[in-house]
Design a protein with these regions (language model features):
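Short, well-structured beta-strand/strand-turn elements
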Residues: 184, 360, 374-387
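Soluble periplasmic/extracytoplasmic beta-strand elements of cell-envelope proteins
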Residues: 244-249, 286-292, 350-354, 369, ...
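Low-complexity, Gly/Ser/Thr/Pro-rich intrinsically disordered linker/tail segments
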Residues: 418, 422-459
Length: 459
């Protein structure tokens, strides 16, 4: 089973070779399990974990994983899933490396009946599964003012047995377009429809390279100790006024494409050990963390960085998922994600976090993880993109796929920032055409003034 962490969708569409299986013996986890939320049933037997994606009108086989160690199963794309039974044998949990939190499991006696019957593959069947997948899992229709039932009534009459694949792809794309949710996508092979919040720009590799070159030439010309880490995804420099500049363009890809989470974590720790060395944090007067072009990745890697920025434990956020197909107001129990001070040198001084509309997904959960950080933390720039959830991959009977969020990330007061994004304390333009043309970086300049003049207080 693939549990897609909060990341750019294009990264999630790449698979890999299946891992080798170890000798298989029955385990306490063998059997059939229903997952709280997520519309998922799991079958575990003979060393194979098989996902079934369910709605009230369908059951389709999803991804599978092979047992590769005690309680661990590895998917074809290299994600390690850890399955545990809890208390008696009828409750359990599953966790994907790189994700934050567990998903609860309840043992059931057998697969639901629809999982044992052939699934029609005609366009109408695909439409019904597509619509129902959003109806039962998408949390934000009300907040976005979308009547999903009216959407069905408008578009279902356009679909019939002779509807072509191109026509159906266009229908699905039109249906989800008004959501303006960059964690929503329609996939048909290499063809993908996805879009972000209006007025924002996706954090592509090309934009990342352009911005990095701009910052190095404009802002870091006189910097010391300029260094790239983690396959170029992290950059650090000491600035002339005693501040540090830390640029993070994603929370993944640190050890190269396809590398397992453990390798990503090793590369991140290696970077942090250099950037936040004991000698440096003793003289650092302020730290700028630049997330303005950040395509997301692993929430857990963001928590790992936050653990190097505090001496006091605190809750980063709590995470919950829709848990009733018929009632969008019912959720799983909120599961807190904790920031625990790392057993390594830690920087606890003032921080300025730079964000914008190209701060996406795990870039946003990391921003949220710093909101209640003890000490002075200020956000400067523009609101983030407004997508936080892990991404559900839903297969359709005709071979297409739908991608959608079903989770909310809550602050201590129960607030979410889906749709609107996390707002800055201080608003500045971020990489507009005028900023590029005039070689200005207003957000970074504001961060320097705040840190140098006020030690992190707003101005």
């Amino acid at each position: 089973m693939r549990i897609v962490t909060a990341t750019a969708l294009v990264m999630a569409l790449v698979g890999g070779a299946a891992p080798a299986a170890v000798a298989q013996q029955p385990t306490a986890a063998d059997g059939i399990w229903r997952m709280d939320g997520y519309g998922t049933v799991l079958s575990i037997r003979n060393g194979t974990l098989q996902e079934y994606q369910t709605t009230s009108v369908s059951c389709l086989r999803g991804d599978s994983a092979r047992r590769t160690g005690p309680g661990t199963y590895t998917t074809p794309d290299g994600t390690v899933l850890t399955v545990r039974t809890q208390g008696g044998r009828d409750r359990g949990s599953i966790r994907a490396d790189g994700s934050v939190g567990d998903r609860n499991l309840h043992r059931i006696q057998k697969l639901p009946d629809p999982c044992t019957r052939p699934v029609p593959e005609d366009p109408l069947a695909a439409f019904d599964v597509f619509w129902q997948s959003f109806e039962e899992n998408y949390p934000f229709f009300s907040a976005k003012g979308i009547d999903w039932h009216a959407v069905r009534d408008r578009y279902r009459p356009k679909v019939h047995v002779e509807t072509t694949r191109d026509e159906l792809f266009a229908v699905f794309s039109e249906m989800v377009k008004p959501l303006y949710d960059s964690h929503v996508a329609v996939q048909d092979g290499a063809r993908v429809f996805a879009q972000g919040r209006p007025g924002t720009v996706p954090p592509t590799a090309e934009l990342d390279a352009k911005v990095k070159k701009f910052i190095v030439e404009r802002d870091l010309e006189d910097a010391r100790n300029l260094q790239d880490f983690a396959n170029g995804r992290i950059t650090y420099a000491d600035l002339s006024g005693g501040q540090g500049y830390l640029r993070i363009s994603g929370f993944g890809g640190y050890a190269g494409a396809g590398a397992p989470y453990a390798a990503q974590l090793t590369e991140l720790d290696r970077a942090l050990d250099t950037v936040l060395s004991q000698e440096r944090i003793q003289r650092l007067k302020g730290l700028i963390i630049d997330l303005r072009i950040n395509g997301g990745g692993s929430d857990a890697l963001g928590i790992r960085i936050a653990e190097r920025l505090t001496d006091i434990p605190y809750v980063a956020y709590s995470k919950r998922a829709r848990n009733d197909p018929a009632d969008p107001t019912r959720h799983t129990r909120p599961q807190p994600a904790y920031v625990t001070p790392a057993q390594a040198p830690r920087y606890t001084g003032p921080i300025a976090v730079l964000t914008g509309g190209s701060t996406v997904s795990a870039g946003e959960t990391f921003t949220q993880a710093l909101m209640d950080r003890p000490g002075r933390t200020i956000r400067i720039g523009q609101p983030t993109q407004g997508v936080f959830s892990d991404v559900m991959s839903r297969k359709l009977p005709n071979g297409m796929s739908a991608w959608l969020p079903n989770e909310e990330f809550l602050t201590g007061s129960g607030r979410t920032f889906d749709g609107t994004g996390i707002p800055p304390h201080l608003t500045e333009p971020v990489f507009t055409k005028e900023e590029f043309d005039k070689k200005r970086d207003s957000a970074l300049d504001r961060a320097l003034r705040v840190l140098r003049n006020h030690g992190g207080a707003t101005s």
